[in-house]
Amino acid sequence: MWEWSTFPQTVPRNQGEIMTKSRVLRGAIAALAATGLVTGAIMAPAKAATRTTVVIVESNALTSLNPSQADSNLVINGDIAYLTSMGFNYYNDKFQLVRNTKFGTYKIISQSPFKVEWHVNPGRVWSDGTPVTAHDLLLNQMTASSAYSKAAGLGDPANTDITPAFNSLGYTSLYDTQVTNVSITPDRLGVVLTYKSANADYELIGPSVFPVHTLVAMAAGEKKLGTPAHNVALKNKFLTAYTTKDTATLKKYGKIWSESYLVTSVDAKTNPLLLVGNGAYQVESAVKDQRVTLVLNPRYNSGEPTSGITKIVMNTITDGPAGIQALANGEVDVWAGQATADGKAALSKIAGVNVKGYATLSYEHTDVRMGDGPGEKDKYTGIFAPGTTAASQAQAKDLRTAYFLAFPRDEIVEKVWKPIGDASAAWDSLNYPPSSPNYAKMIAANGSAMYREGTQASRTAAALALVKKYYPTTSADKPTAKVRILWGQPSNTRRISEAAIIKAGLAKAGFDADVTPVSGWSAHISENKYDAMFGGYGISAVLQKGLTDNWQSGIGQDMGYSNDKVDAAILALSGAKLSDDKVFANYLAVEKEVYGDAASMNITMWPGVSAAVNTLQNFKPSPLTPEVLWNFWEWKF
């Protein structure tokens, strides 16, 4: 039966952070070229006699064991990390931040300056038996502190032309802008973070937890697990390099962190140091584009005890109907793919399966390129290139505006999203959901009116007039203004439909849209050869700054957008707790600039659909990423 949870009426001030980055790409590898995959290839069938294995359908494929690396910001990678690592807190399905006291504690120890002590419980260990200590809480200094990166000679993350030694998503995060000092506690089990000011979201601006001894070992060429005593010595080497800012040594660690975890398969040849974690499960194997198998970590003591599930198998089935058929056949236990109307209907007909519909905090959006992507060597010269003159910048803005005017958002919502969730609607705020009491007030003032007033036909006519100013021979019949749009895989039914609607809609405004799908598209977002993109983001945390840092200048700005007023508003939202009125004012400042610059448009919030066999207990998806996995330790048959 269908169960619809309610979207929170309070403002979801949510900018998800996996490690230190705000959002994770939804369905970024929603369909690899694996259309030949058949359900018979699925391992560990759900009907096996032993009921200690859970088999999950994934529409993504593993690309990295490090989701904080700049090209690895994918939901599947984050899901694996969620199962294999534990930190100081997590979100439940009620938007409540829960402290993980099995792992450690944190507390405010000073209001002025604002200091928080983060402390690991004694006896916590990594999967190789090495103690978890303060050393393992220091990596954020390299992966999320621009100040430390510059001081240690690891590169200036603000320089988008040169990739820093740690190619991380964390720069420009709250950790980067708010943490001013890190010190180690006398017992070497904790760190004290000093913040720029009292911070509303300090609980989400803590240290990452990473087995730093593995970086030191791999940098030295080691390819097997060491003893705890050996690894403690390696930790101390890391600490020395950190405290002395040993540039050469830290760069070696950065190379390992940035490159070695980019794996698509795991087998006997894989360096076991890459698989060390403190989570409930460890990656046992991974077959490229097919499946990832995780087994219990026998040394796990950093979180809630599991309830009987000893193995989790995540099978990549990129074809939606095939995944649903696998559930119907009893070959898998959990389906959490990208739903379609037909898929929703098919799920509802499967006996012995609980189908859950819920409002997620994942959403569909489209962005246009405003400038060079970080690390791009060649300048962006596409249709939206702003150039250096007032005339060229005006032309670029006109063409961007035309793109959004002609973008067939309403048709996409009606034909693709409403059949899945009746409440689906075009989303005109960049922060507040339609259910928020602030939504109407925001969209009346943020500059989005031009993209919803009149009919789509009248908006498209206005768009065509703008395009013809610069492409006088273009027409709806023979569009000549070329725009290259980045999106996902050809076997993703939803995206196929969207791409076709977008191409046809933009053609009416004189745009000749190239909507060729790209394998592993999320790794290409920063590339200057693409003029625009559309896709989905998943949100994993609730922060005061909301979704605003999608438009923050710097290395995390894939589309080359930069606006001083936007950056100032984001900075104001990143500090002390603000009143609702001040939060609204800063959100409005951001939205007016982004809409005024014709930089971005949200399409709709995703209706969530997932399903599980009714013998799997405690299956209760959360609106926040990682959705179905958030309480995996409670699962049992």
Question: What is each PLM-predicted segment?
Answer:
Residues 157-257:
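Surface-exposed binding/hinge segments that line
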Residues 10-48:
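Secretory targeting and sorting signals
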Residues 612-637:
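Long beta-strand-rich cores associated with HINT superfamily self-processing modules
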Residues 20, 93, 118-152, 270, ...:
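Extracytoplasmic/periplasmic ligand-capture domains
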Residues 57-111:
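N-terminal lobe/hinge region of extracytoplasmic solute-binding protein
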Residues 2-4:
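Tryptophan (W) side chains
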Residues 172-174, 251-286:
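Alpha-helix-centered segments that form part of catalytic cores
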Residues 51, 83, 103, 111-113, ...:
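Extracytoplasmic
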